[in-house]
Amino acid sequence: LEVLGSILVLQGKGSKDTTEIVVLQCAELMVRSGIAYSHKQAESLITGAITSGKALEKFKQMCILQGVEQATATTLVDNPGTVLPSSNHITDITASQSGYVSEINSMVLAEIARKHGAGRFTIEDEIVPDVGFEIVVERGEYISAGSIWLKFHHNQILTDAEIATLTSALTTSAQEIVVHSRLISVVE
């Protein structure tokens, strides 16, 4: 799912917060390496590369240079769902009440994902790459009770307790939420 998320960002279809963090990190690298003279210039170059498709093309070239066949790399960037592994089940988790998305408890999500193979309890445990989450709402967005906010990709059947726990991971507010940049400060 991480590869899919990366491809979506490069296609210009990624979540706002993931795209923001990618652009911020890339801009910092470009400024520090002398490719850009300012963060503003770097951000403009990065968003231009995403919009024009150059960033996605560079990703495809990187895959080919690492041994992926050209036809597979092309399919990966054009239609990633046909190449990437997929889980046996996708469970939609819905909001229990209406309101503005104020918080998603990532620790709750991580613990359940780990139980289903997306993480390790011991160093010997195997990670199952097709297990994970798609969060389909963003902080500050209004959601109605019963609307899907999370898709869990998994191979084992979820228990009722796990579904209830996932449902409880979303907190909403009756008041609008002010969403700030994910960047608090740059430590040099």
Short names for language-model regions:
Residues 1-188:
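Well-ordered secondary-structure scaffolds
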